[in-house]
Regions:
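Hydrophobic/basic alpha-helical segments
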Residues: 1-288
Length: 288
């Protein structure tokens, strides 16, 4: 039954959002996201377009004996602090139900705030990791280094690495709690005291990467998948080889896997998109 629902939902998304309302769509299992771009002065028109689209989807689902769950429907504005200050639309009405536009939403376990600083998500992530480390500390004396390292990788490192590519471009102040988690986990594995230096141990003994290199590694993996067509289309479209551009003269650099970079923009949100971030990955990394 869930498979049938997904097929019908995918057909509905393709029929209405793309053709009639020009809304972008991201869908994972039964979790669907609609997004679109607009200026702050046009927020009322944008809300009307989204509401009309959802109303048509609801009518189609009702005719096919499905139900749209308005209780789980959430809305959020994304932008800079200056842009958000110009937005005066804070509610949306669906089928007579007024839904407040939130300042934070959760998508696949990641808390997204309006300015995409991910401060709330990092705070929640670090709290859960420290809780797991406290639990492991209580049984540390009964474990050897290998077993402790395995448990840390399972309960802590897996949380740190989950969706960490979204932290690219986030300020060092927000990433500091994650690095603290890595440091505490390393001290637990090698049984060092709280204020002992741990940087060289992380690098030489445990072979762990610091948080900023973990982010760079994840971006390189995404770019590699995009170039080999094993990533979603909305990501692959952001990564193009210089040699694939039509009408461009072919040089020897075509074989060097240089990627097309868009025009530099000083907006912080734009600089964090994959089209700009893949410039941090050298062609030597991508060939590995």
């Amino acid at each position: 039954m869930p498979g049938i629902v997904q097929i019908m939902a995918a057909w509905c998304i393709d029929k209405y959002q793309h053709q009639r309302h020009s809304l972008g769509v991201h869908s994972y299992a039964d979790d669907t996201q609609l997004y679109c771009h607009s200026k702050a002065v046009s927020c009322q028109a944008l809300i009307a377009r989204v509401a009309s689209c959802i109303e048509e989807i609801n009518e189609w689902m009702t005719s096919n004996r499905l139900k749209l769950n308005t209780d789980k429907t959430q809305f959020i504005w994304l932008g800079t602090r200056q842009q958000l200050a110009k937005v005066h639309c804070h509610t949306i009405t669906l089928r007579g139900t007024t839904i407040n536009i939130l300042t934070e939403v959760t998508c696949l376990g990641v808390v997204i705030d309006q300015e995409m600083k991910f401060a709330s998500h990092i705070k929640r992530l670090s709290g859960r990791c420290f809780y797991q480390l406290r639990q492991l500390r209580s049984i540390r004396r009964s474990l050897n280094i290998s077993s402790t390292k395995t448990l840390v990788n399972a309960f802590v490192a897996s949380r740190v690495d989950y969706c960490n590519s979204v932290f690219s471009g986030t300020g060092a102040v927000h990433l500091r709690p994650i690095q603290s988690v890595i440091n505490v986990a390393a001290r637990l594995v090698v049984r060092k005291r709280k204020y002992d230096k741990i940087t060289s141990t992380i690098r030489d003994d445990l072979h762990w990467l610091p948080v900023w290199q973990r982010l760079e590694y994840k971006i390189c993996v995404l770019v590699y998948k995009c170039l080999h067509r094993s990533a979603p289309s909305y990501l692959s479209s952001m990564c193009a080889n210089v040699g694939t551009i039509e009408g461009r003269r072919h040089l020897r650099s075509v074989t060097w896997l240089f990627l097309v970079r868009p025009i530099k923009h000083m907006d912080r949100a734009v600089l964090r998109c994959l089209a700009h971030l893949h410039g941090t990955c050298s062609h030597y990394h991508l060939e590995l």
